[in-house]
């Protein structure tokens, strides 16, 4: 042992609550199902899942720049740029000069992009409607509120500026 270096005592991680583990397992399963469902549905439209998420953000957002899109999708700028490049080649998105910032470009959906996003959205919402049909409306509303709250809480813990591998805030 090197006497010049202080001894570091690492405390054992506290045991996870059973609810935490059960929650994690249930949420992980739901995410896996939705990821598969998204890949399965979206690939029918000759568009990747990342491109679909970006197209949805551009159609549903207002005045998005590439930096805005990257932050919204938790992507680095170069990855977001490649996704937008593909959407632009397919004729779904166009870049236009920002009226207030000459160094920046705004992402705008083309009419074909709007139509594609609406087709995919209708397909997915039809699936969601079938999924929720067995639940009472009050349960659906409560689930929606809880999922939104969970998404906000999770987003507040994400380092969108590049991640924090191996570090939990």
Predicted regions and their residues:
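Short, locally clustered residues in the helix-turn-helix/winged-helix DNA-binding domain
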Residues: 31, 56-60, 121, 148
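A short secondary-structure junction motif
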Residues: 34-37, 61, 116, 123
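Short glycine/proline-centered loop/turn elements that form peptide/ligand docking sites
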Residues: 44-48, 79-82, 86, 136, ...
């Amino acid at each position: 042992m090197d006497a010049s270096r202080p001894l570091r005592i690492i405390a054992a991680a506290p045991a996870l609550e059973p609810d935490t583990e059960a929650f994690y397992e249930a949420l992980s399963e739901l995410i896996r199902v939705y990821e598969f469902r998204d890949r399965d549905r979206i690939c029918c439209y000759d568009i990747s899942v990342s491109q679909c998420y970006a197209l949805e953000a551009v159609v549903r957002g207002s005045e998005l720049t590439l930096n805005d899109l990257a932050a919204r999708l938790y992507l680095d700028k170069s990855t977001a740029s490649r996704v937008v490049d593909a959407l632009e080649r397919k004729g779904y998105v166009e870049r236009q000069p920002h009226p207030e910032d000459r160094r920046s470009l705004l992402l705008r959906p083309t009419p074909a992009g709007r139509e594609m996003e609406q087709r995919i959205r209708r397909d997915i919402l039809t699936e969601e409607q079938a999924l929720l049909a067995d639940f009472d409306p009050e349960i659906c509303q409560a689930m929606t509120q809880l999922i939104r709250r969970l998404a906000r809480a999770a987003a507040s813990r994400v380092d969108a500026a590049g991640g924090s591998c191996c570090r939990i805030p």
